[in-house]
C-alpha cells in the first residue's frame, strides 16, 4: 500500500496539471508515483484474487484450475 503522503502528492500533481502545466521535474515525479501506485494496486488485487475460493450454489468448489495451481504453490486453502 502506498503511503498517504504519496497518494496526496499524486493528487496534488494531478490537480496542478489541470490548472497549469507541470514542470519537467514534476512530470517525471508524477510518472514515477503513478507507476508505484499501479504496482501496489496490482499487487494488492493479485493477492486478493489469489486468496479466493469459488463455490457454486451446491457448495462445490469451482475455482479455476489456474488459480488452484497458484494456491497450491502458495499453500492456500489447503490445496494439495
From Swiss-Prot:
It is found in: Cytoplasm. Keywords: Cytoplasm. InterPro entries: DUF896. Residues 60-80 are annotated as: Disordered. Transmembrane segments: none annotated. Pfam families: DUF896. GO terms for cellular component: cytoplasm. PANTHER family: UPF0291 PROTEIN CBO2609/CLC_2481, UPF0291 PROTEIN YNZC. Belongs to the UPF0291 family. This is UPF0291 protein EF_1580. It comes from Enterococcus faecalis (strain ATCC 700802 / V583). The lineage of its organism: Bacteria, Bacillati, Bacillota, Bacilli, Lactobacillales.
Amino acid at each position: 500500500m502506498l503511503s498517504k503522503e504519496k497518494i496526496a502528492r499524486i493528487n496534488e500533481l494531478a490537480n496542478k496539471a489541470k490548472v497549469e502545466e507541470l514542470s519537467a521535474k514534476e512530470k517525471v515525479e508524477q510518472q514515477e508515483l503513478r507507476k508505484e501506485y499501479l504496482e501496489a494496486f496490482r499487487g494488492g488485487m493479485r493477492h486478493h484474487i489469489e486468496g479466493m475460493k469459488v463455490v457454486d450454489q451446491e457448495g462445490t468448489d469451482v475455482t479455476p484450475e489456474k488459480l488452484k495451481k497458484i494456491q497450491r504453490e502458495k499453500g492456500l486453502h489447503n490445496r494439495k
